[in-house]
Regions:
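N-terminal beta1-alpha1 cap of cysteine-dependent amidohydrolase-like domains
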Residues: 1-77, 83-91, 95-123, 129, ...
Length: 195
């Protein structure tokens, strides 16, 4: 079974765990003893704001997976964390990508991997106020909102990918009728893993 380190908390990130399990993977939480050594991939979930630097422990976890050439998927804050780890910067506050309750659904333009998985114009959900400003070294944008906000990034030579939106909230049991089926994000992530 493909083991994914979900770098979060079980009580806060259950939707991510459910998506990984439904796609065929097993979830390992950071507090599990010896879990890090046995994992085949890393999922960085959404969460709070990033202020200039990543917490040291998070940066070390990312380094461990990147240096071993293992797949890494960042979602929302996780994508922002990857961008910062690779030396990129963030817009600290943008408007138009959050609403008081629930996700905001909007169109996007996709190329490359994002288009291959989701089509060229996928409807996606948003709930964030930080975003990529300058891309990190080796990263390229492959999806954008209508206002130019980067919605997905890939690394040119490493199995590293991030999405600003929330595929865990528009796939499998949480599939939405008003947005693209995001299950391919998780299937692709698990397909990149060699046991």
């Amino acid at each position: 079974m493909k083991k994914i380190l979900l770098y979060g908390e079980e009580k806060l990130h259950g939707n991510y765990a459910s998506a990984i399990r439904t796609a065929g993977g097993a979830v390992v939480w950071p507090e599990e003893p010896h879990g890090l050594q046995d994992c085949h991939g890393l999922l960085l979930p959404g969460g709070g704001d990033i202020h200039d630097r990543l917490p040291l422990c998070e940066a070390q976890v990312i380094a461990r997976f990147v240096e071993r050439g293992l797949p890494v998927l960042g979602i929302c804050r996780g994508m922002q964390a990857l961008n910062v780890w690779f030396g990129g910067t963030l817009h600290c506050h943008i408007s138009g990508h959050q609403q008081p309750r629930g996700d905001m659904v909007h169109g996007s333009r996709a190329v490359g991997l994002a288009a291959w998985l989701l089509g060229p114009s996928p409807q996606i959900n948003s709930n964030h106020h930080q975003a990529v400003a300058v891309l990190g070294v080796g990263l390229e944008a492959v999806q954008w909102a209508a206002d130019g906000t980067v919605e997905a990034i890939v690394h040119r030579s490493l199995p590293v990918w991030g999405v600003q939106w929330h595929p865990e909230r528009q796939s499998f049991r949480l599939r939405r009728r008003d947005a693209v089926d995001a299950a391919p994000v998780f299937w692709h992530f698990l397909d990149r893993i060699e046991e």
